[in-house]
Swiss-Prot record:
Similarity comment text for this entry: Belongs to the glycosyltransferase 4 family. MraY subfamily.
Subcellular location: Cell inner membrane
Species the sequence originates in: Actinobacillus succinogenes (strain ATCC 55618 / DSM 22257 / CCUG 43843 / 130Z)
GO cellular component labels: plasma membrane
Protein name: Phospho-N-acetylmuramoyl-pentapeptide-transferase
Length: 360
């Protein structure tokens, strides 16, 4: 929005030209989301307490979690509001990929809101009925993916990029829609599963979003993409603004979500942030890189799949409890230790993912 205003004012005041620089807008997007979060946070927490939007806790979970019952949840509303505001302020609103990303973010946020509200209303951890939850997640994903496909079909925007191999970039055609759907829905649920401890999900999200800001810039730059042997995809450079907004909003939320948490993001936040990471990965053609950089999310999801599969087939559990962060809690690890170690793993995987851009 401010890009258009600055462009108009530039003819009268040349100093407004600085707003056209992507790097300047990226930093301002991050700071805007961060400062808005710090300003909104206390007010949001107070409102959630007034409305009695408190967290429900599983009765079969770790005993240390019982004290979390009643902690304000649905703080993800703050995350979505600040990401959206910052993206609209500093992004180029003529860019279709900004709108696709916001559509998934807000669409998944709405689904998460209903899920959270039902948990609070009925005072259990069930939430939205699973089949309806996945139905609406799928509807939002397919609308976004079909739009993205129509924008980029028959171009490098629908090629598959394989890490470590510079010459393997097959054209996906219609399979792009299938792959993109599973990436978006899968990542959304993976982040949702990870959001079980104070700050556990938000910091890896910040790391991955920050890395994707760099990748989006490279993918949208003709010379840099050619140098790195990745496909040049027009429109993606503007996703830097969206990514840095996620970083700023995430850090602002962490201020209140760090152990012991004053507020939880709830499904309204985790489903939306996961969907946002998924759609960014698809748009910059780095689905495989998301698996590497989002390794903590993958690990949490795989632990649940293995636990459920093992119990159904052998009537035995592999872990004391899944997702795997609960396994370590039940082994006696203090919650902050689990969180910080998972953050360290996440940071290492993100750095590894960035290195693979050059190792081809």
């Amino acid at each position: 929005m401010l890009v258009w205003l600055a462009s108009f004012l530039e003819q009268y005041f040349s100093s407004f030209h600085v707003i056209s620089y992507l790097t300047v807008r990226a930093v301002l997007s991050l700071l805007t989301a961060l400062l808005l979060s710090l300003w909104i946070g206390p007010k949001m927490i107070l409102r959630l307490q007034i409305f009695k939007f408190g967290q429900e806790v599983r009765n079969d979970g770790p005993e240390s979690h019982f004290q979390k019952r009643g902690t304000p949840t649905m703080g993800g509303i703050m995350i979505l509001a600040t990401i959206t505001a910052s993206s609209l302020l500093w992004g180029d609103l003529s860019n279709p990929y900004i709108w696709c990303s916001l559509f998934v973010l807000l669409g998944y946020g709405a689904i998460g809101f209903v899920d959270d509200y039902r948990k609070i209303k009925y005072k259990n951890t069930d939430g939205l009925i699973a089949r309806w939850k996945y139905f609406w997640l799928s509807v939002v994903a397919f609308i976004a993916v079909f739009t993205m496909y129509m924008i980029g079909k028959d171009t490098d925007a629908t090629r598959l990029v394989v890490p470590f191999f510079k010459d393997i970039m097959p054209q996906l055609g219609l399979f792009y829609i299938v792959l993109a759907y599973f990436v978006i829905v899968g990542t959304s649920n993976a982040v949702n599963l990870t959001d079980g401890l104070d700050g556990l999900a938000i910091m890896p999200t910040v790391f991955v979003a920050g890395a994707f800001a760099i990748i989006a810039w490279a993918t949208g730059n003709v010379e840099i993409s050619k140098y790195l042997y990745i496909p040049y995809v027009s429109y993606t450079s503007e996703l830097v603004i969206f990514c840095t907004a996620i970083v700023g909003a995430g850090l602002g939320f962490l201020w209140f979500n760090t152990y012991p948490a004053q507020v939880f993001m709830g499904d309204v936040g985790s489903l939306a942030l996961g969907g946002a990471l998924g759609v960014i990965a698809v748009l910059v053609r780095q689905e495989f890189l998301l698996v590497i950089m989002g390794g903590v999310f993958v690990m949490e999801t795989v632990s649940v799949i293995l636990q459920v599969g093992s119990y159904k087939l052998r009537k035995k559990r592999i872990f004391r409890m899944a997702p795997i962060h609960h396994h370590y809690e039940l082994k006696g690890w203090p919650e902050p230790r689990v969180i910080i170690r998972f953050w360290i793993i996440s940071l290492m995987l993100v750095l590894l993912g960035l290195v693979t851009l050059k190792l081809r």
